């Protein structure tokens, strides 16, 4: 399975109509945690098991991984979790617009593809349009949590979110001040990075009270 796919290729630019929350979940009124780049899904599977009064959505651009995650989910009979294939920069906004305002409580972006070459920065997942879509759907005190073991990437991500007026950084200053995953569940990459004694940079943003305007 390829580690990286080019989200700007023609295939991934085709918008997908994602299933609505009422189709995805039996209890569609529950608060939602959205994990962008859910990879093998172990983080959300454990979290969904521990938090039955939340709904969890994992979005992943590598379709074989989505199939693998859905197979695991069905085996565990988790009805508060779904994994979906899509390019979030193309298909997320429409799906979020279907949610009740404020239902989206948490968004996590953990160890995304770094795309090191400057000419490939535009392939990185976090962009202004995604942040605005999230800001439009999220009410005050909603969360965006990001983490990476690559300083240049976390710096890029924090700079991008800092420029957005709808989110306020909770831990200003030291990017290492959050010493563990705030949801008390670790991703596979997080576990591997800790075993290698790599520094992990974690940042939490809070949706402020500014009303969203286009």
Swiss-Prot record:
GO CC aspect terms: tRNA methyltransferase complex
Keywords: Methyltransferase, S-adenosyl-L-methionine, Transferase, tRNA processing
Residues reported to bind substrate: 117, 149
Keyword set includes tRNA processing: yes
Reaction(s) the record says it catalyses: guanosine(46) in tRNA + S-adenosyl-L-methionine = N(7)-methylguanosine(46) in tRNA + S-adenosyl-L-homocysteine
Alphabetized InterPro entries for the sequence: SAM-dependent_MTases_sf, tRNA_(Gua-N-7)_MeTrfase_Trmb, tRNA_methyltr_TrmB_bact
Binding site for S-adenosyl-L-methionine: 35, 60, 87, 113
Gene Ontology MF terms in the entry: tRNA (guanine(46)-N7)-methyltransferase activity
Pathway: tRNA modification; N(7)-methylguanine-tRNA biosynthesis
SUPFAM superfamilies the UniProt entry points to: S-adenosyl-L-methionine-dependent methyltransferases (SSF53335)
Active site: 113
Entry EC no(s): 2.1.1.33
Function as written in the Swiss-Prot or TrEMBL entry: Catalyzes the formation of N(7)-methylguanine at position 46 (m7G46) in tRNA.
NCBIfam families: tRNA (guanosine(46)-N7)-methyltransferase TrmB (TIGR00091)
Stated family: Belongs to the class I-like SAM-binding methyltransferase superfamily. TrmB family.
Protein name: tRNA (guanine-N(7)-)-methyltransferase
UniProt source species: Prochlorococcus marinus (strain NATL2A)
Gene this protein is translated from: trmB
